A protein has these predicted regions:
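Active-site-proximal, glycine-rich beta->alpha crossover segments in alpha/beta enzymes
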Residues: 98-202
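Short, Lys/Arg-enriched N-terminal segments with co-localized hydrophobic residues
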Residues: 1-6
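Conserved, mostly hydrophobic/aromatic
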Residues: 30, 72, 138, 199, ...
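Pocket-flanking alpha-helical
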Residues: 91-94, 138
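Gly/Ser/Thr-rich helix-start
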Residues: 39, 95, 157
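Short beta-strand segments at enzyme active-site cores
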Residues: 80-83, 151-154, 207-208
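N-terminal basic, low-complexity leaders that serve as flexible interaction/assembly modules and, when applicable
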Residues: 7-92, 144
Length: 208
């Protein structure tokens, strides 16, 4: 999955990753991994048992904070990545999203402009507020590490999220999405434009 990354910094402490990104020279190379949190960690597998529903897990500040911090605690990485999922956006928009064990995410497909218009973006930030609460707690916990790790925000790229919303889940060839985009670009762009707007708001709120 392609993701948009942003740095969430609310402290004046020097952070290796931020300084290197700003062009400063260091003998040490900052390290973070795209999938540094999650199922490869035994402590995550134990933590995951505390919530039957994966989206509920993502919306729980307590659980998402711990999932974010676990790889920092284990590997001393230079940045934590906000533990979340790209499908919180369609879920917040009102699309039916379910994570089925053994199958992955299943969504009620968006098939036309009428389906797009049923999506409600007015309360997205309110719906996602537990994620922003988690960010505040993550920042506080990261201060406990002497090497001052940064925090990288998280959201799915609009095209990637759109493919899940249109296909109703993962796909090998994304035929339905590509067909709609090529045959009715003005219709499909309404979904992309909506996702660009909502995702931008979500990322800005992560910084604020």
């Amino acid at each position: 999955r392609r993701t948009k990354l942003l740095m969430i910094e609310k402290t004046k402490q020097k952070k290796l990753l931020i300084e290197v990104l700003n062009g400063d020279k260091h003998d040490q190379i900052p390290i973070w991994l795209m999938r540094q949190a999650g199922r490869h960690l035994p402590e995550y597998k134990k933590l995951r048992l505390e919530s039957e529903n994966f989206l509920d897990f993502c919306y729980s500040p307590k659980l998402s904070v711990e999932a974010t911090i676990q790889p920092i605690r284990r590997y001393n990485l230079d940045a934590a990545i906000l533990f979340s999922d790209i499908l919180v956006i369609p879920d917040a928009l009102g699309q039916q999203v379910e994570f089925v064990p053994g199958k992955g995410p299943i969504l009620k497909p968006i098939t036309n402009v009428s389906s797009i218009k049923k999506l409600n973006q007015r309360k997205v930030l309110q719906y996602l507020s537990p994620i922003y609460q988690a960010i505040e707690k993550i920042i506080d916990q990261l201060k406990m590490f002497s090497f001052n790790p940064s925090l990288i925000g998280f959201a799915g790229a609009p095209w990637t999220v759109a493919t899940y919303m249109v296909e109703g889940g993962s796909s090998k060839d994304y035929h339905t999405t590509r067909k709609w985009a090529y045959e009715s670009p003005h219709e499909f762009s309404q979904l992309i434009d909506l996702l660009v707007d909502v995702t931008s708001q979500h990322l800005i709120q992560q910084i604020d």
